[in-house]
Amino acid sequence: MTEQRPLTIALVAGETSGDILGAGLIRALKERVPNARFVGVAGPRMQAEGCEAWYEMEELAVMGIVEVLGRLRRLLHIRADLTKRFGELKPDVFVGIDAPDFNITLEGNLKKQGIKTIHYVSPSVWAWRQKRVFKIGRATDLVLAFLPFEKAFYDKYNVPCRFIGHTMADAMPLDPDKNAARDVLGIPHDAHCLALLPGSRGAEVEMLSADFLKTAQLLRQTYPDLEIVVPLVNAKRREQFERIKAEVAPDFSVHLLDGMGREAMVASDAALLASGTAALECMLAKCPMVVGYRMKPFTFWLAKRLVKTDYVSLPNLLAGRELVKELLQEECEPQKLAAALLPLLANGKISHAMHDTFRELHQQIRCNADEQAAQAVLELAQ
């Protein structure tokens, strides 16, 4: 930062989640430095906060090998152009938000030109392809991590990392209102309620929906009043789930929801879900859960050799023990899933203990991440 110009922060976000993080960071920085300038690759939320978009975020938001290969020339052109233009601009700090395949190389290019770089949101290097940590260390001055065990991993390799807490933990209340959520969904306050979340990807919904439905059928034999809510992320996943349900359980009554995953978790006594961010959200909703996951045999064989962690779900990784039951591959079948869920639906000691631990873990990662990230950027800019 010089006397002649305002604090200048360059940012690159590659998808909607990054746009949300970038907007929160910009907002927190503007509160401290009102005349700061923000430029880079931005989505609508970042632009609404005043970020000047040299490229639209959608340019980077490609998924899948085929799509990436089809856009590779354009992506490489954008990265080369940003390397040149940021090099000329000399921002006080560059912040690459997630999108590691694009951003980490860009961060390395900029660091060689003397520009300070931050990578915001650690890739899952602690879980697999751990040698990426060395490239990240060469490319960045600082990694901003959502979770404490991520910082512990970087510390082991002497890569500067700051634990800032998780934005989702900031956004969700420590004590959610179950009855209010039930009112929104039309679920009676005194009924037993189970949430089924078979994933956001097509392959997950295809692999898990039938077994999740069969599990719910078994549970309703014990709890005839069992209300079952199934939030689905979009119309495509809903159509897919409805097709599978028509084959497996055509007359079985469930509440299908368009989105509303968070409300479903808060409203429910227990949840059966695929792993991923949903498990963290379910923990923050204080909803006892069982994780069920299945993938193609070769993919699972490969994952077992590549993944270096003892657990797949974030609640267990945060707790450092099997806090929630994980039933994977051949273990992910209706009898075993139902047996794991039954004591949670009873809403007794097991559920209460899990709820209390979820609350403790929530407090650990509720650190006002936007403010922490802004503070880290300003400290590096000085």
From Swiss-Prot:
Q: Which GO terms describe its cellular component?
A: membrane
Chain coiled-coil ranges:
none
Report the catalytic activity.
2-N,3-O-bis[(3R)-3-hydroxytetradecanoyl]-alpha-D-glucosaminyl 1-phosphate + UDP-2-N,3-O-bis[(3R)-3-hydroxytetradecanoyl]-alpha-D-glucosamine = lipid A disaccharide (E. coli) + UDP + H(+); a lipid X + a UDP-2-N,3-O-bis[(3R)-3-hydroxyacyl]-alpha-D-glucosamine = a lipid A disaccharide + UDP + H(+)
Q: Does the keyword Zinc-finger apply?
A: no
Q: Identify the EC number(s).
A: 2.4.1.182
Molecular function, one GO term: lipid-A-disaccharide synthase activity
Q: Which Pfam families match?
A: LpxB
Pathway given in the UniProt record = Glycolipid biosynthesis; lipid IV(A) biosynthesis; lipid IV(A) from (3R)-3-hydroxytetradecanoyl-[acyl-carrier-protein] and UDP-N-acetyl-alpha-D-glucosamine: step 5/6
Q: Please give the family membership noted in the entry.
A: Belongs to the LpxB family.
Tell me what this protein is called.
Lipid-A-disaccharide synthase
**Species per Swiss-Prot/TrEMBL record:** Shigella boydii serotype 18 (strain CDC 3083-94 / BS512)
